[in-house]
Each structure stands twice: as C-alpha cells, then as structure tokens.
Amino acid sequence: MAIPAFGLGTFRLKDDVVISSVKTALELGYRAIDTAQIYDNEAAVGLAIAESGVPRHELYITTKIWIENLSKDKLIPSLKESLQKLRTDYVDLTLIHWPSPNDEVSVEEFMQALLEAKKEGLTREIGISNFTIPLMEKAIAAVGAENIATNQIELSPYLQNRKVVAWAKQHGIHITSYMTLAYGKALKDEVIARIAAKHNATPAQVILAWAMGEGYSVIPSSTKRENLESNLKAQNLQLDAEDKKAIAALDCNDRLVSPEGLAPEWD
C-alpha cells in the first residue's frame, strides 16, 4: 500500500489534547495517523481511534521504534507493546525513529529485526527516519531498498534536504517530510504570503501543497479544528512553476531538529 500523501502528526501532543486532535481529524476525513513510542501518546491515540468508530481497514497508522528498543531482542517486544497501546493487531508502517547513537546497535541488526516484525505481520511496511545517505546505504545493504517504504526526515522550505531526497529517489525510497512548516516559522515568510494571497490560500496550505507537489508525504499536527480542516484542503491546491521556483529559493539549510547525542552527522 502506498504511503498516504497526507496524514496527522502527533508529536508533542499528549493525553486529552491528542485524543481531541485525533478524533477531530478523523471526523474531518483524515485517515493516516503518525505516532511514536517516545511521544508517550500511543495509548491515547489508540483510545481516540477506538472512540472514533472509524474501521481499522480505513486507517493508516505509523509508529516509530525508540533507540532503547533497537536491539534484536527488544525491537519486536516493544512493537507488540505499541500495538497493545494502539489497540490494533498491526500497524501499517513502523519506522526506526533515529539511528542508534554511536552505532551501539548496528543498522544491520535493527533493520533485520524490523523486517522480521514485518514477516510476523506486526507491521505492513517498514522504514527509517532521520537517516543520512551513508545510513540509507547500510539500511539497503541490510534488507534491500524494496523493503524500505520511506525515510521520514525534517524537510521544509528552509531545509529542502536535496542531497538526501535525490539519493532516496534514485533508490526508490519515498520521502516523508516532518516539520514541514518549520515550527511555524515558514508561515510568516513574505514569499509564502505572496503565493498564498495569489491562490487565496493560507500559508500552511501553500507549504503543504508544495511538499506534496514534490512527491513527499506530509504529517502536520494541530490542536485546532479550523487548522486541521484548512490543512486538509492543501491537497486541492496546485502551485505553478513560478511558485515552486520561489519556494526553491528559500532553502538555507536551516535545520531545527538536531538533538545532541542523537543526531547523526548530517549530509
């Protein structure tokens, strides 16, 4: 199954806040939900899905394995725990959230454990997140490019990550963009504002439409119903060549997510 182009992110949302966000999103027509073990909200997401009444087969659920669970003896048990919290027998996509710091657990070990989880039916697809080109090479060597559904990376108008994108594309690895709106910084951009005015759209719609137009999946989060609804309409917005050129010129390698002790050496 192809990764949906548009989904709901849940980073930094917990308890009642995430329950409300997920239920509202599902009510509005969202069907892809992105969570992670470290977000500490899988149980709340599971509850929201259960209460929404949306049938499981209509949903595309992604979770991510945290670094403490990367070893072959921990990965599958940790995923089973995630499934329990999410109240489901399987997830659609499981990602390695970050590569193991200092290569404590080798890429080969955790990718093969993840592939085993797929073979056991715990996850339909597997993938990676925050992987550089050398790390993608190792992941491909471990399980084959055909088994890597996506690389979820920070990607916004200010960090277009072109080297990683080009390399992934060349090897048939889809890109999912997180932090697409650059923590909201890009919403205040004059170039984006001009494009938004031209299309009678919001700045968020312009940025999300740009990313989807480039072929990336996006997973914006929001706690406000009007923003959830408005963001969804980005799927109907078509930018022209002039717009795309203007956004391409905003790239300035402005990376916002690079946790010390966790981040690899970026490309």
Swiss-Prot record:
Stored SUPFAM superfamilies: NAD(P)-linked oxidoreductase
Entry keyword annotation includes NADP: yes
Compartments, as annotated in UniProt: Cytoplasm
Recorded coiled-coil stretches: none
InterPro entries, per database record: AKR (IPR020471), Aldo/ket_reductase_CS (IPR018170), NADP_OxRdtase_dom (IPR023210), NADP_OxRdtase_dom_sf (IPR036812)
Record-linked Pfam families: Aldo_ket_red
Role of this protein: Aldo-keto reductase that significantly contributes to cellular methylglyoxal detoxification by catalyzing the NADPH-dependent conversion of methylglyoxal to acetol.
Annotated protein name in UniProt: Methylglyoxal reductase DkgB
Annotated source species: Escherichia coli O157:H7
Gene: dkgB
